[in-house]
Amino acid sequence: MIFLDVETCGFHGPATLIQWATLDGEIQLHDVWCTPIQETLDLIYMIVDDEEGIVGFNLAFDWFHICQLYTMLVQFPDPNERPIDHIDELAILEEQGRFGDCLKPVSALDLMLHARKGPYQGTMNRSDVKVKKVPTALAWEVAKELDARIPLKDVYFARKQDVKKRWQVMDITDDFGDIIPDFKNIVLKFAPSSALKALAADALGYDTETIRMFTDIELPTQCQPTESGYAPFALAHGKPGDWNWSWPDVIRIHMEHWLFNESARKYASDDVKYTRELYHYFGKPALGDNDSILACMVGTVRWRGFAIDVDGILKLKKQAVEALAAMPHNFNSPVVCRTYLEQVMDETERLNLSYQDRPSTRSIILEDIANWTEDTVCPECKGMGENDLGEECSHCSGGLVKSDIPHKAARRAQLILDCRHAKKEIELYDKLLKAGRFHASFKVIGTLSSRMAGADGLNPQGIKHATTVRECFPLADCGLSLCGGDFAGFEVCLADAVYGDPDLHADLVTGKKIHGLFGQYLFPPMTYDEILATKGLPDNEDKYARSKNGVFALLYGGQEYTLSTRVGIPEEIANEAYQRWINKYKVWGKERAKIFDMFCSMRQPSGIGTKVTWAEPSNFIESMFGFKRYFTLENQICKVLFKLAEDPPKHWTRMHLKVTRRDRVQTASGAVRSALFASAFALQAANMRAAANHVIQSSGATITKLLQKNIWDLQPIGISEWLVQPLNIHDEIMCPTKLEMIPEVRKIVDLTVSGLIPKVPLLEIEWGDKLETWASK
């Protein structure tokens, strides 16, 4: 077993130092650039062939650099030479190294990923907690009280300059950007670190004042190379004689830094020391879990990259540039966007252009507005929403008659969205063209549900599904043929397995589309067949697509508000649709209610407006495959907010000050209590949604990872030619494959899916062989 870490020139340049040790052996520092090439190659051979495997912290990063280094050095004709004496030659060979052999260790354990499966999941990025509209007179006292009542670990703020800075008092501005003097927001801004040293300080008890952090020993900014994660080689940035400050221009500085700076060398040695100690702290976990194996796979696959059609990408970029140039305004400016929308909005409609008490034209707002229609006042009830008997009007919804004619603001919102999408597309195409390949990079556990997430400046999961785009991604080259497919109705079959509703299962087995089933309730009185018939119609007329948006919102924990914004229907109709759905599929409704009940810590047994009581919530939710999403931190904060709202300090209640908060005149302490309760309920609601989301998304992540890992098992251990090169995007697995291995890959796919059928009865993958492009699947 080898404990491994590397130091590099920048984030994406070649390794400068390899630190390693056996289970009980002395820590070794191998200086790459001043050592004969053969010695480095021999070390890599030893690491790859170790019979137990490797243990590291963030192996996707380290293994990428081992592969990058090996494939560059192995091409050099004289292995007795030192790399530092042949910088230009090696920089030229580096690019070609992407087409070299595959490196795969015997086994692996990534302790960063292991930590993310337990309570240290809390070190992953998370949203701020806000207490909104607190009277200014009490704002700083409330912040101080929250600091005192909620003891939070420094690791949750490790990326801040001042880790002790927790709850902050923030100004609130009105629609004109002016500060509202009477109220403040109190915000808990997390800046957690899952870095090795931060975890070592918290788990192993090292003094944060004496532990060496990278910022303590790193070279100054002017010594860092020009680089990019999506084009991770020097020739993407420069050429011999003009390297444009990419790594060939600074490698000597980095070599000398890691060779002669004793503090830097101690820092590097500590990396292995802490990794080994964490291995023991976590109870010597077994090597070979799927996530750790995939971390090494992600690193080596990222370095190789995937084939793209450069001419096709150039054509797409030209079209996007032309579309952007044709836009009537500069939609890069939020002020321009807001003004453009307000021109066709009335005073009430303009209230939608805000987010968290600030003016905003963020995408989620524009997506909602893009669904607006030109509704008219109901002539039957004159806009009252009820008849003379007080009964709900059967001709309208809340006094308005819906239409399929887009609102003027809807058209403008969609135009702004199109502009932003075109801008993002151009950025993507520029990145791909710079590299000449698609260097897909992932965080193996990138979200709290364990899903993979894009990394290093290019998000593979953001690439459009459009055929014209995916035709430009042949993906396979160098003698490999593209295979791949995606899971059919993935989220739906997972929901069927998770909730186990026999009525829904019976409908799905007959081939009925869940989007059509739900669409009947979203767009009454339309029938199932009428919903399906709208598929492909323009704009809001496509009720099938809008129903599909509603289904995904439903699957991921959304209720009436989310359904309303995602589908573009009034909240009352969304609520009625949700209630009709869970009344028809009662087991679904009961199982969903169980999840919500697990995290419903604050309850009003006697109804809205009555006393709120506290019930201890669950600390985690578990997927059908056993991956836990922890809510320990959120529950801790929520409970303190509740307790403080229930029983604030007495001197707050004695303050004789009245304020008007959300159209209600309250005492200052009463307004504080309202703000605290609102924050606690918002946090609770977020937990409930995340829990409902988790049982679907985490299960999907486990399945796609399992299939990737099983395909990757076909790649030989050690250093060898490429046989398979898996890539996971959402519910798709694409895999350039050596021709003779295609039947073996197909067999693995079939065995994996059939093995999961007992847990996920409707699981199915539509797999194809010898595909021309990503669009062919």
Segments predicted by a language model, with ranges:
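Entry/capping segment at the start of metal-dependent catalytic domains
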Residues: 1-15
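Conserved "right-hand" nucleotidyltransferase catalytic core of DNA-directed polymerases
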Residues: 7, 132-191, 204, 212-465, ...
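Active-site-proximal helix-loop-helix substrate-binding element of RNase H-like nuclease domains
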Residues: 12-16, 20, 24-279, 283, ...
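Active-site palm subdomain of RNA-directed nucleic acid polymerases
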Residues: 282-294, 703-733
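Function-dense linear segments that define catalytic or interfacial modules
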Residues: 441-536
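A common structural junction motif
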Residues: 585, 750-760
